[in-house]
UniProtKB/Swiss-Prot annotation:
Protein function: One of the essential components for the initiation of protein synthesis. Stabilizes the binding of IF-2 and IF-3 on the 30S subunit to which N-formylmethionyl-tRNA(fMet) subsequently binds. Helps modulate mRNA selection, yielding the 30S pre-initiation complex (PIC). Upon addition of the 50S ribosomal subunit IF-1, IF-2 and IF-3 are released leaving the mature 70S translation initiation complex.
Gene name as annotated: infA
Organism of this sequence: Erythrobacter litoralis (strain HTCC2594)
Protein family (similarity comment): Belongs to the IF-1 family.
NCBIfam families per UniProt: infA
The protein, known as: Translation initiation factor IF-1
Coiled-coil segments: none
Length: 85
């Protein structure tokens, strides 16, 4: 599957589940089951309940997602430069 086919959506972590899984509520109100991407695991980026995250979904299964970015309060997202100072 090519990367162009992935859907990126913003969401909020609402529940921590076993085996490094998370229940994420997307901007549109849908809830998906998410897991952290390998680079986030490798760099030990913690994801907690209430965190704003960026998820990648495949058009073939819209119930599962990969968490690729955790938004920091007061900072911009990926590719947005520094936040307010």
């Amino acid at each position: 599957m090519a990367k162009e086919e992935l859907l990126e959506m913003r969401g909020k972590v609402v529940e921590l589940l076993p085996n490094a899984m998370f229940r994420v509520e997307l901007e549109n109100g849908h809830e998906v089951l998410g897991h952290t991407a390998g680079k986030m695991r490798k760099n030990r980026i913690r994801v907690l309940v209430g965190d704003e995250v960026l998820c990648e979904l495949t058009p073939y299964d819209l119930t599962k997602a990969r968490i690729t970015y955790r938004f920091m309060p007061g900072r911009g997202g990926p590719g947005q430069g520094p936040g307010p100072q």
